[in-house]
């Protein structure tokens, strides 16, 4: 009986520790379809407006690809955002102090990318209504 109780306690302890983990698989945004009729320039503007409004800094903007960096306290993430008039992607490029290892990263990175994606889509919908 004592062994069963110890085994149950061990299982609960291990389960509790795994629930506290902050690492998740990296969630890239791959070929997000743009449903509005937008030019490459309008898509670029929607991306840069979204990024800067959320604290991302555009560090490169060449040939339908934007590189953006976000710094939050000691953490930094860099993404590549290739785009066209029909789709865009947000791809992990590099990070500092986000526990990147084996395709996993701190969950805040995925939240930052999801927020960026949502804001880009919102900006594209606003641009669509102004046509």
Where are these regions (language model features)?
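C-terminal motif of bacterial Sec signal peptides marking the signal peptidase cleavage site
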Residues: 15-19
């Amino acid at each position: 009986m004592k062994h069963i109780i110890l085994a149950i306690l061990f299982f609960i302890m291990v389960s509790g520790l795994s629930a506290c983990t902050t690492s998740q698989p990296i969630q890239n945004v791959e070929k997000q379809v743009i449903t509005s009729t937008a030019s490459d320039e309008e898509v670029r503007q929607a991306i840069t407006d979204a990024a800067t409004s959320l604290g991302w800094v555009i560090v490169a903007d060449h040939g339908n690809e934007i590189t953006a960096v976000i710094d939050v306290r000691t953490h930094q993430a860099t993404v590549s955002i290739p785009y066209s008039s029909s789709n865009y992607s947000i791809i992990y490029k590099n990070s500092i102090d986000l526990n990147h290892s084996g395709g996993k990263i701190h969950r805040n990175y995925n939240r930052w990318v999801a927020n960026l994606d949502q804001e880009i889509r919102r900006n594209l919908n606003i641009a669509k209504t102004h046509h």
